[in-house]
Amino acid sequence: NLTAYDTALGWRYPNPHMKEMYGTDQMGETAENIAEMKPHITRELQDAFALRSHQRAIAAIDSGRFAEEIVPVSIPQRKGDPKIVDTDERPRRDTSMEGLAKLRPAFKKEGGTVTAGNSSGLNDGAAAVLLVSADKGRALGLTPMARVVASAVAGVPPRIMGLGPVGATRKALERAGLKLEDIGLVELNEAFAIQAL
């Protein structure tokens, strides 16, 4: 006896016992849960953060900052030449505060603050990192780009899953004997502006 949902969001195979214990909020709903917990982070603040992210991404793309990080992918077409995808398609050049303000809440119709504009899109991508020991790196003649000094995991209630990195970051910094101010560059997965803020 199986219940299944055809969806890109949320649970495909809901477990009624898990639903009783934790709820079955989809990711966008968990972002709205965070917004309810943090009412001082307004829709306008979320939109401003999202706008800045789009602007920074476009500036980085235009300056070639990702040129060595993105491998072009060739996609055969039924007719004509293959389509070459070599640029992140998510950042929008025409994003503005006025445009973002016009978007309706996507996950909570009444009083919601999370929209398609201050959320990440549903798009495909992939990433790879080669991790080796210092000895193996030397043996292969590799020049390291980074060194792992600490790692950590942290759990949070599923209904606010987007806050998990906060506790994990604090634990990793403590293990490394570092403070956030000691870090020169932070790469943040901005699934939702509310989560990042």
What is the predicted function of each stretch?
Residues 34-40, 137-141, 170-185:
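Phosphate/pyrophosphate-binding loops at sites that engage ATP/ADP/AMP, CoA/4′-phosphopantetheine
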Residues 1-6, 70-87, 159-160, 180-197:
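Conserved beta-ketoacyl condensing-enzyme motif
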Residues 29-33, 52-59, 99-102, 168-171, ...:
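Alpha-helical scaffold segments in soluble metabolic enzymes
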Residues 44-139:
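N-terminal extracellular/periplasmic Venus flytrap/periplasmic-binding protein-like
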Residues 18-26, 38-51, 91, 111-127, ...:
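Active-site pocket-shaping loop/turn-to-helix segments
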Residues 1-34:
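Flexible glycine-/small-residue-enriched beta->alpha junction loops
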